[in-house]
């Protein structure tokens, strides 16, 4: 019998090649997973290190400035995802705690699942829940999302449930529309249209709808000019500037501006208010930022993960202003 060219060694090499490729692919997958978990760990560590101590928060309980006392009304305290300093963010427990603690405003992150259900969930929280980076709410069905643990046994709530339960108990409820889902809702309905339907279905007359996407906000305005909307002003990256999010004179008819704290200043607020708009500063999670938005750039509302100390600080400052006037 004639021996095949190359013999047994060639045969073994031919059989080994697919196995080596499979091992390389598995190795790449394991490496990618490790990198992703490492990124999540670093993000969690950075977030932990950013949490101010009780001693640091004491720095916001300072005598009010003339700028603060010149306010015509106290600023709204908008609990970012509820009282997310003490409860898992964007959960029913966090929103209930914020309302019970006196917050007069809630900021709610709303995204669409793959099968078109609106839920209250931020992409950042989802990545931590599934321990994977790069995923979006639109990658999952509502059934899959509803089975996830949002923290401490809490579940991801439907947006409808949150608005129905809590909008009657606050002055303002902000729906922050998230549009980063791949395949969420699908054409032709946009997230803006879905959020508008949500506000109408829940009779949320005190809802403000805003998003980083001007296109979505314009779509809402075209569907219902009477709906309160806002747009985001930020200048953190070249992409923000490329997409025009650093511009103040956008979206005629939008009465609310969600302004990143780094952009906020007395002169900028004066320019924005000249057009009759309200300004909400975000996200005030350090004593320095809180003092800036209270004393230097007096915004109309402050979005924060720490509503409790902020509420106390505002109360003390308002009393001090009143006492100063009486004297």
Q: Model segments located where?
A:
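Phosphate-group recognition and catalysis centered on beta-loop-alpha active-site segments
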Residues: 2-327
